[in-house]
């Protein structure tokens, strides 16, 4: 018995040891199998879900409230925005109250464009003289410097000498105490030169058609000036016809026809190389038959054939007088201000050939040589009808001497 009891104890001991080691006995009795590990799944407690749901609903409710507030604000602002927009439109179309002044017209008008157009010329004369006279005493040296500056501005020797002579006489009579008074007197002297020639063109309605013969060298803006004048007269209620008398340049004829088509103005033209006098004669007949108020005739400007050109212009005038002995009623020379002293020689040449009655000075906005207008006015005493300070139709305006002088001498801050 003792032996059996001891044997059972030994077997249990060995089995216990095998279980620990995972040996044979453990395999035999299935004790070595690993139990399947339970799958770990995310566990969301229902109570936490219940706690979160009210928070989400609260946030969503807050968002809706914010959106409603934004919508209410936007709706409230709409009438204000409409009022502001209406006020802006009202301001935009509100007529500007013009302050009466003898110095210059209202801001934004032709005077404003004239001031801008004369910026380059003002650097040499006019407002550009303010710094020149500042702090200087009146003596011979000052007059010499002034004379040099006037010549640089293309005022020319004869006109410059005349201005200096008059200023010197005022100074010798003790009428000018300082350089500022000399500056003001210079303005007066220059105005005195321009005022006698500021004569606008007056159309005689008893003469139908009233014939304007345009002359000038190629490139001065003659054909463009014709188009602008035609539009101006048309806007005044006058009927206009154009005659393409520059038959040597196809481009000139085409340009005139474009102006005519654009403004519904009839243009009389013939083929390139036709006789200019014949074209203009036909135009006079046509204008009379249609009861046209104003006929503007273009002419050639080939200065390289100076003698031939002058002979042709003389012929045109003779032929025109055969139809109407009072025609042409205006012989207007177009000059480019940028040519400086060359404009003087051109004026002399055309005046001797056909006898000018008026001048249009173009391209004043693109040159520093605008001082030539004083030389032209002083030497020829011919009426200056129009000046051009830009490419727009309204930039060709009747010449006003006082307005021109004010624009020339006005300062940026004034």
Curated annotation (Swiss-Prot):
Catalysis performed (reactions): GTP + H2O = GDP + phosphate + H(+)
Alphabetical UniProt keywords: Cell inner membrane, Cell membrane, Cytoplasm, GTP-binding, Hydrolase, Membrane, Nucleotide-binding, Receptor
Enzyme class: hydrolase
Keyword Cytoplasm on entry: yes
UniProt topology in membrane: Peripheral membrane protein
Enzyme Commission code: 3.6.5.4
Location of this chain's protein in the cell: Cell inner membrane; Cytoplasm
Cited SMART domains: AAA (SM00382), SRP54 (SM00962), SRP54_N (SM00963)
Keyword GTP-binding in record: yes
GO cellular component: cytoplasm; plasma membrane
Location (main, coarse): membrane
Gene Ontology biological-process annotations: protein targeting; SRP-dependent cotranslational protein targeting to membrane
GO molecular function: ATP hydrolysis activity; GTP binding; GTPase activity; signal recognition particle binding
Binding site for GTP: 216-223, 298-302, 362-365
Origin superkingdom: Bacteria
Family according to the record: Belongs to the GTP-binding SRP family. FtsY subfamily.
Assembly behavior: Part of the signal recognition particle protein translocation system, which is composed of SRP and FtsY. SRP is a ribonucleoprotein composed of Ffh and a 4.5S RNA molecule.
Function: Involved in targeting and insertion of nascent membrane proteins into the cytoplasmic membrane. Acts as a receptor for the complex formed by the signal recognition particle (SRP) and the ribosome-nascent chain (RNC). Interaction with SRP-RNC leads to the transfer of the RNC complex to the Sec translocase for insertion into the membrane, the hydrolysis of GTP by both Ffh and FtsY, and the dissociation of the SRP-FtsY complex into the individual components.
Name of the protein this chain belongs to: Signal recognition particle receptor FtsY
Taxonomic path: Bacteria, Pseudomonadati, Pseudomonadota, Gammaproteobacteria, Pasteurellales
Gene assigned in the entry: ftsY
């Amino acid at each position: 018995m003792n032996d059996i009891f001891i044997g059972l104890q030994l077997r249990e001991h060995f089995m216990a040891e095998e279980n620990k080691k995972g040996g044979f006995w453990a395999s035999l009795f299935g004790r070595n199998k690993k139990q399947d590990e339970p799958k770990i799944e995310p566990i969301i407690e229902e109570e936490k879900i219940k706690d979160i749901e009210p928070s989400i609903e609260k946030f969503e409710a807050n968002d809706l409230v914010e959106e409603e507030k934004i919508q209410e604000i936007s709706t409230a602002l709409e009438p204000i925005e409409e009022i502001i927009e209406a006020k802006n439109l009202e301001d935009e179309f509100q007529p500007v109250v013009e302050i009466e002044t003898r110095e210059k017209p209202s801001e934004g008008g032709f005077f404003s464009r004239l001031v801008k157009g004369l910026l380059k010329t003002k650097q040499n004369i006019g407002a550009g003289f303010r710094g020149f006279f500042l702090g200087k005493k009146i003596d011979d040296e000052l007059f010499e410097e002034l004379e040099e500056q006037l010549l640089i501005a293309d005022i020319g020797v004869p006109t410059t000498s005349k201005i200096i002579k008059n200023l010197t006489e005022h100074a010798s009579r003790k009428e000018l105490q300082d350089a500022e008074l000399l500056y003001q007197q210079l303005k007066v002297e220059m105005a005195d030169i321009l005022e006698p020639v500021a004569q606008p063109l007056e159309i005689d309605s008893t003469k139908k058609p009233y014939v304007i013969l345009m002359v000038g060298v190629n490139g001065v803006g003659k054909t463009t000036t014709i188009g602008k004048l035609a539009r101006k007269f048309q806007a005044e209620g006058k009927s206009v016809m154009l005659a393409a008398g520059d038959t040597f340049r196809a481009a000139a004829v085409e340009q005139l026809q474009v102006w005519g088509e654009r403004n519904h103005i009839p243009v009389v033209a013939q083929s390139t190389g036709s006789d200019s006098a014949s074209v203009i004669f036909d135009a006079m007949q046509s204008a009379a038959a249609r009861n046209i108020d104003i006929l503007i005739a273009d002419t050639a400007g080939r200065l390289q054939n100076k003698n031939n050109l002058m002979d042709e212009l003389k012929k045109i005038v003779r032929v025109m007088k055969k139809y109407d002995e009072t025609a042409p009623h205006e012989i207007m020379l177009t000059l480019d201000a940028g040519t400086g002293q060359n404009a003087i020689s051109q004026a002399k040449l055309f005046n001797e050939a056909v006898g000018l009655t008026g001048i249009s000075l173009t391209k004043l906005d693109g040159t520093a040589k605008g001082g030539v207008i004083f030389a032209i006015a002083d030497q020829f005493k011919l009426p200056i009808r129009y000046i051009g300070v830009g490419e727009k139709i309204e930039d060709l305006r009747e010449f006003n001497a006082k307005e021109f002088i004010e624009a020339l001498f006005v300062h940026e801050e004034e």
